[in-house]
Amino acid sequence: MRQAGSEPGCATFRGLPALERRLACELAYLQLPAPRWTPVRDYEGRGVDDVAIVGAGMAGLALAAALIQRGIAVVVYDEAPAGAEGPWATTARMETLRSPKQLAGPALGIPSLTFRAWFEAQFGSAAWESLDKIPRLQWMDYLRWYRAVLALPVHNGHCVTDLQPQADGRVELQIEVAGRPMRAWARRVVLATGRAGLGGPAVPAFVASLPRARWAHSSDDDDYGLLAGLRVGVVGAGASAMDSAATALEEGAARVHLLVRRPDIPRVNKGKGATHPGFVQGYARLPDDWKWRIRHYINTQQVPPPRNSTQRVSRHPNAHFHLGVAIESVDERNGALLVRTSTGPIELDFLIVATGFAVDWRQRPMLRHLAPHIRLWKDRYRPPPGADDAELAESPDLGAAFEFQPRAGSHCPGLERVHCFCYPATLSLGVISGDIPAISDGALQLADRLAGLLYVEDIEHQFARIEAFAEPEIFGDEWVAEPLPPLTP
């Protein structure tokens, strides 16, 4: 069998309308989507959706498409305006995606739904061959097309402010729309809220007392043009640190100093050593010791920044890399920031902390009624000496359907009806709930699990459907009944 990516030449469709016709054919060949098979439910005169998804970024769209394929009624809520969901057109600052261009992403196994098909339909196969990596904003254009061509039911400008599971099989969603409250109900709710899905930026203590105008997190939606002429420090050496540093330099910062605690910048992305179907399908089946060992190892090795992102910084003569520099304190002095480090002080005008994200329930008021009851990995597992890891310890201990599970002794009926399809699911179930390489695997797995849960809950209804089914295969006129012949004497 020919390896993926080695094909001599795939068919190129002339324009998006032709591609969309081909996509419609592929879906028809696969008999997708399935007709709805779940019972219609209502509460207080309003419909109860089978599944409500919070977040219309890549993960939310992929899951919505997978659920619709399975004949499940779904609705998606996102607080962002249409076309601005996720980080791609807002807070992300990389020039191109870090993932290889050929990955299928959220295509769910459908060739005409891939980025490559979308790209070649518009620009041709020669342009595809010459493309190195996918431009960030072009990826967002693709996701907008993905949503439109599949007619996914996304409600923008809908900010979910509270989730309250009910004992009768519903989850109540409190939603704010244009400053006005509304309520909705669903049998299951899925959080597709991205990298910061159960919290927000991890903010180091040394900036906590500084005026907010003097520092930013790399995920903030700030105008870097305001950094023109300033001395800027960037804490960290990961991809987001490089993206922030490069953007500051391009916007005219006088100098940018990268302050890196480690004595060297990592060279190898160890996570790429597990990008194969065995890891995707097998990780969730591993015992706790192996899950912790794998994720802790990757955390301690850290992920290097992409080469092109690093060169985007280093090509500027006013970019300075300082390694082995741990920040001890930061104070305002004489209109500037005095940053004391393990190797000496430095004076800056502005500080950007590229310190990632953390599970922090205080930053997710939507989950305030659930957070005290959610079991975490620190409630489940004690790592061996030397393997403590705060990020892993705070991760939720999820079930096979990404569902939250209750802490021992807690009482929150319906908690298991809320599912965590975002980055903090990684320790429990693997890297299948947010990153491009395996997002289709995660979406399809979760859709299958949800379909199974809904069917089991509805077994009385489903059995009644079997009993009521009356479509004949034959009509009785295909034969003539006659008695057995007499025995021969």
Regions found by a protein language model. Give the residues of each.
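Flavin (FAD/FMN) cofactor-binding and adjacent substrate-gating region
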Residues: A92-S125, K272-L286
